[in-house]
Amino acid sequence: MTQVAAVAQAVPRAGEPVRFRAASADDAAACAPLVFASGVAEFGFFLGESDTRCIAFLQQAFRSRHGRFSWRRHRVAVGDDGAVLAVMAIHDGQRTTFDDVHVVWALARFFGVRRTVGQLLRGLVLETELPAPKRSQILVAHCATDERQRGTGVFSALFRDALETGALPGDGSREVVLDVLTQNVRARALYERLGFVALPRRRVRSRRLPDELASIRMRFGGRDRP
C-alpha cells in the first residue's frame, strides 16, 4: 500500500461537507487566528507582542504574495458556507531563499525598525530549534483547526488532500518534515497516525530558548527511508 493510500484509508472525511483548496489573500482574516493558534508560544516569544497584535501582523503578512506567512504557502479546508475550518502551510526548501528578507520587511513595516531588531534576535534563537527546511526538504507548518472542528478529522483530511493533489509529495521523492512542541502530546499523536516519525535530535538546544519551546522534528514516512 502506498503512503497516500495508507493515509486515505486511515482518515475518514469530516462529518459535514468539506472542500479543500489553495488559500487566497481573501482568507487572511480567517486564517491569521488559526496560524497564530498553531504556535501561540512560538509567536509570543518571537514577536513579543499581545495576542491581538500578533494576529494583526499575521493577517497583514498573510495578504502578501511573498514570504513564509503568505497566502501562497497555505492550503485550507472550508465548509459549505465558505468558512475556513483548518489550515496548513507548505514550505518548499527550494523556494525559501528570500524568506528572511521578506520577514524583515514585514516586521519593520508593521512594528517599526526598533521593535524589529529584538524580534530578529529572538527569531534567530527560535530558528535553532525550528530550522528552515533544507533544499531537499518540504516543511509542513502552521497546522491548525478551528476549535469547533477539532476531533472531527478535518485536518487529517486536509493533509490527505495535499498528498492526493500533489501539493505534498507522497512518493518519498522529497523529505516532508514538521515540528511539534515536546509538550504537545496530542498533536504528536495525530502526526504519528498520519505517518510521521520523530527524528533523533542532532543539535544542542539554545540556553536562550524557553523550556516550553522545546520541539521535536518529525518526518513523513520516515520508517521507509534509510
Feature names for model-found ranges:
Residues 137, 172-177, 181-188, 192-194, ...:
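C-terminal "cap" of GNAT-fold acetyltransferases
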Residues 145, 151-165, 189-193:
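Conserved acetyl-CoA-binding loop-helix of GNAT-fold acetyltransferases
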Residues 94-138:
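Conserved acyl-donor/pantetheine-binding loop and adjacent beta-alpha core of acyl/acetyltransferases
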Residues 76, 83-92, 139, 144:
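Conserved beta-strand in the GNAT
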Residues 1-26, 216, 220-226:
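Conserved N-terminal entry element of GNAT/NAT acetyltransferase domains
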Residues 39-62, 97, 109-112:
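Conserved GNAT-fold acetyl-CoA-binding loop/helix
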Residues 19-33, 44-45, 92-93:
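A short beta-loop-alpha structural element at the N-terminal edge
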Residues 51-74, 79, 129:
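Active-site rim helix/loop that mediates acceptor-substrate recognition in acyltransferases
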